[in-house]
Amino acid sequence: MTGPALTVVRAGALTTVQDLGRPGHAHLGVPRAGALDEPAHRLANRLVGNPGSAATLETTLTGCGIRVRTATTVAVTGAPCPVTVDGRPAPWGAPVRVPAGAVLDAGPATHGLRSYLACTGGIGTEPVLGSRAADLLSGLGPDPLTDGAVLPLGPPHGPPADADAVPHPGPGTELVLPFVPGPRHTWFTDHGLRTLATGRFRVSAASNRIGLRTEGPSLERARTGELPSEGMPLGALQVPPDGRPVLFLHDHPTTGGYPVIGVVPERFLAPAAQAVPGTPVRFVPRRAAGPSRRHTG
């Protein structure tokens, strides 16, 4: 491989290539995939002069390290973490010029879960269905990165831009998830619906890019049995037989047979990407009509 590229020297727990995903293919059984914390992904790209659609690296908890073949501007956003270039401290949430052959390391997250690493030109792997995103459910796109993997970089799009927003540090002490009830809320008793709105839930360690699983009280069902498989949207709150809701994230299955008690609007999903296991979760019912004027979650 010739031209600009990076080599993964430390892949971390889970590092994947992500962009804005591949929407519009659910009828083929293909989920959207893409960056779970889209605002952080977009900001990282902006800081290095890329469009928001350029591919970045999404790290999970332990970060990653890369060696660049040619001098490259890199930015790390999302979950705050220590950033170094050849062992010397570098800023997080700002463009960093990395000399040819140098190693930039994004260390373990100090708050939150997922960091985003953008390079000038974006990750240039081959698109699949119009996207470079790794889809861990269907297996589309690049595999999760391993030590020694070499990734091409695209041509620069323009000079790095000044940041006009402070990188979001992730959720606070509680993850607040507004949801619109339905379409299968009638499958649950009034007590089950109250439990969802008032119960004390926490993020489960079994959560992943497919869904945020919860620990806490079980939601009481009014009906037995299961549904025929039906379409599952991004943000669906599906309730499996154990009664504990699962929030479907970007690699979710496009169909399922467990009832969906509500749907979390997409604009509220980014904080879920940064919620570490054990984070308290509060579900807040809201009306379907009319956009929210203010989001405090």
Show which residues each predicted segment covers.
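Conserved "landmark" site that anchors the functional core of diverse proteins
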Residues: 1-297
